[in-house]
Amino acid sequence: GIDLYELSLLEKQGMKLFYTKARCGTCHKPEQNGSGYFTSFANIGLDINYSDPGVGSLSGSSNLNGVFKIPNLKNVALTAPYMHDGRFSTLEQVIDHYNHGIKPNPNLSIELSNLNLETIDSLQNLPSFSTTLTMNGGLTIEPIKLGLSVEEKAALKAFLLTLTDEEITRDIKFSDPF
């Protein structure tokens, strides 16, 4: 039989934060295409000036500078270092980035802007909307400041850890594909 895991109170609080105040669920959405690898693309405000322009280098469009694939969060506890360049070694550092370290940027994905979620939802429903759209006539988009408390950050991390299947670290069939 399958052992079902019941979330603790702390993990449930983290799950609620994931989909509300922390806004994680606006980008890290459940798979829709079944591929399991990436969910979309976004500029998450890592840099103001880019040593790696991401999709912008492939497209030739400066509006896409700083845009990278958004991975799903399956087994997130096992996939450090984090971000396209490995700049964060812990989930705490990632949470801190989203909590107060997002840099203002004209290409910042709207989900991380200081717009409220209702405004974001209404903009995303427009036929011509793109999450990498330069807003405000090219002015820098101000990032959200989540304001997560120490307790909320701990709850969010606790939930993120539930997305990891520890069985793959113990079961020999997953150890060496060659």
Residue ranges with predicted function:
Residues 1-178:
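Periplasmic c-type cytochrome electron-transfer domains
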